[in-house]
Design a protein with these regions (language model features):
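A charged N-terminal "starter" segment
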Residues: 1-116, 404-410
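Hydrophobic/basic alpha-helical segments enriched in Actinobacteria
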Residues: 21, 26, 30-31, 48-53, ...
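Glycine-rich tight-turn/loop motif centered on a GG-T
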Residues: 23-34, 97-101, 119-126, 166-175, ...
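Active-site-proximal beta-alpha core segment in soluble small-molecule metabolic enzymes
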Residues: 57-203, 208
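Active-site loop/helix belt of alpha/beta enzymes
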Residues: 157-282
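Short coil-to-beta-strand transition motifs
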Residues: 294-301
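C-terminal accessory subdomain/extension
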Residues: 307-410
Length: 410
């Protein structure tokens, strides 16, 4: 019996029929979330977390309505925001009273607003990795003239070899060794106006790197070996860093992991909570994971507007490219109907995208082609709303950040 996954031809055909029927009165471009897939992914992610709570990564959702939907489910607790201005907007909108800003901030207006509000100061935790950031905050608002600010230390989770000459992972925090983390904890504890409540270590080389890249089995096997060794190293170092920090503060949480590493990060006894977001929408990049692949749940529709040749169909738009190192894996994928691909010489275009493949000849002017974005929340930068589909019916409409006319957080 084949897995219940829309990558299989019959199920993809059924999905196309359902989405076309549900949105028949809408004109592309527009976005859709398949609620059955979204909810199933939310449940599966909690199952992979092994009993630890999961904080939802807002950058991978970018819709307050869908964030509320996730947080109403068992196992999900709190938000990881990507900007302090966003965290304020989410808190004031009643999305959550537990928001961790995943990155340092130098937004003076936002810092001053949090510092002046007992409610915001209690709900929002700032990220720091250096004394310079503490100095910046103090320059904005004096310690004796503000609410105590909650802070979390960001530990570098990358794997360094050969004395640091070989770096595997991303360039985030300068704090790599436990003693460095402990030193910052001591500095925070000695300063008025701050309260150290958490530690975070995001293992991007495990959580954000697919270990089964299509067509590259040797590379995949090598990645899995590297990831396993990196995880072993990180568990020991993160445990030591947590111990060093706990000498100066009674931590409320130790955060780690992402969609691609929930099942492994949860095995680290020093970690008390996890983070996930991309797995809710199931974007293309997560097709390259072996242990678990989310069911595709988010799509955007385009229309066929021309037929330059009998075997090519061209859609209007389509070029919604993902961030990160430039490459083919950042392109959106034409998903429905099955049997379409981008042209290597043109890719996904700003205004039009030609498509070839076995399904191209059967497409007519006005037909729809459904794409999946390479990443998750970034698709919402192009959309005012997401049509929430269940079966072949639009059950509701969720505004995106853009649709709510939110400030430009990034």
């Amino acid at each position: 019996m084949p897995p219940a996954h829309p990558r299989y031809a019959a199920e993809r055909s059924d999905l196309r029929d359902r989405l076309d029927a549900a949105t028949a009165r809408l004109d592309p471009p527009f976005g859709v979330v398949d609620l059955d897939a979204f909810d199933a992914n939310a449940t599966a992610l909690i199952g992979r977390a092994g009993g630890k709570p999961v904080r939802v990564a807002s950058k991978s959702v970018r819709s307050r309505e869908l964030l509320r939907r996730v947080l109403a489910r068992p196992g999900w607790r709190g938000v990881m925001a990507y900007a302090l201005t966003e965290a304020i907007w989410l808190a004031e909108g009643g999305v959550s009273d537990d928001i961790l800003v995943g990155y340092p901030t130098v937004d003076r207006t936002a810092v001053a607003k949090v510092a002046a509000s007992p409610e915001l100061a209690a709900a929002i935790t700032l990220m720091v990795d250096s004394v310079d950031q503490l100095d910046f905050v103090d320059a904005v608002t004096a310690p004796d003239q503000r609410e105590p600010l909650r802070v979390c230390i960001d530990l570098d989770a990358s794997w360094k070899l050969l004395g640091g000459r070989l770096h595997i992972g991303v360039r985030r925090s300068p704090l790599h060794r436990p003693e460095q983390t402990g030193a910052l904890a001591a500095a925070i504890a000695a300063r008025p106006g701050f309260r150290l409540v958490g530690l975070m270590a995001y293992e991007a080389q495990i959580a954000g790197m697919g270990d089964a890249p299509p067509g590259h089995p040797v590379r995949g096997a090598a990645l899995r070996r590297i990831q396993a060794r990196s995880l072993r190293e990180l568990i020991g170092r993160r445990t030591a860093a947590v111990a060093a920090v706990r000498r100066y503060a009674d931590l409320e949480f130790v955060n780690g992991g992402g969609t691609g590493s929930l099942a492994t990060t949860t095995t680290d006894p020093s970690v008390t909570e996890l983070t996930s977001g991309s797995g809710l929408y199931g974007p293309v990049l997560f097709d390259a994971y072996r242990a678990w692949q989310p069911t595709p749940a988010a799509f955007f529709a385009t229309s066929v507007v021309r037929r330059p040749t009998p075997d090519i169909a061209t859609v209007h738009g389509g070029g919604w490219i993902a961030s990160g190192a430039a490459g083919a894996d950042r392109l959106p994928e034409p998903w429905l109907p099955a049997g379409l691909h981008l042209l290597g010489t043109e890719g996904a275009g700003e205004v039009q995208t030609p498509l070839a493949g076995s399904a191209a000849a059967g497409l007519r002017i006005g037909d729809r082609v459904w794409f999946r974005h390479a990443k998750a929340g970034e698709v919402c930068e192009h959309l005012d709303a997401l049509q929430l589909v269940r079966g072949d019916t639009i059950e509701d409409v969720a505004l995106t950040y853009r649709g709510e006319r939110a400030p430009a957080f990034l």
